């Protein structure tokens, strides 16, 4: 099987969401889903709001990134999470 690298864009619900705590939660979530977190970064958006990007490495399988994306969207302090880049290694 091939290895997949995905870049997931995560939008927090508000600027008050603690950035470092959110990053740590996302890392733990990725690892609980049998994947590796290859990096977490953030970029400022506007008015104190920021976007978090998570790089995920996993083996290609049925359903792909759907379980991880759904789990991220289910987090209390996450407005949205979506895969913005996907490539095979």
UniProtKB/Swiss-Prot annotation:
InterPro entries: eEF-1beta-like_sf (IPR036219), EF1B_bsu/dsu_GNE (IPR014038), Transl_elong_EF1B/ribsomal_bS6 (IPR014717), Transl_elong_EF1B_B_arc (IPR004542). The keyword Protein biosynthesis applies. GO terms for molecular function: translation elongation factor activity. Signal peptide: none annotated. Transmembrane segments: none annotated. Keywords: Elongation factor, Protein biosynthesis. Promotes the exchange of GDP for GTP in EF-1-alpha/GDP, thus allowing the regeneration of EF-1-alpha/GTP that could then be used to form the ternary complex EF-1-alpha/GTP/AAtRNA. NCBIfam families: aEF-1_beta (TIGR00489), PRK00435.1 (NF001670). Belongs to the EF-1-beta/EF-1-delta family. This is Elongation factor 1-beta. It comes from Methanococcus maripaludis (strain C6 / ATCC BAA-1332). The lineage of its organism: Archaea, Methanobacteriati, Methanobacteriota, Methanomada group, Methanococci. The gene is ef1b.
């Amino acid at each position: 099987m091939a290895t997949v690298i995905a870049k997931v864009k995560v939008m927090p619900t508000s600027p008050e969401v603690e950035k470092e705590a959110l990053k740590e939660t996302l890392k733990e979530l990725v690892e609980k889903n049998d994947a590796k977190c290859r990096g977490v970064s953030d970029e400022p958006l506007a008015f104190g709001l920021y976007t978090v990007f998570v790089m995920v490495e996993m083996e290609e399988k049925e359903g792909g990134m759907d379980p991880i994306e759904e789990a991220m969207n289910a987090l209390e302090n996450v407005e949205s999470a979506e895969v913005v880049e996907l490539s095979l290694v």
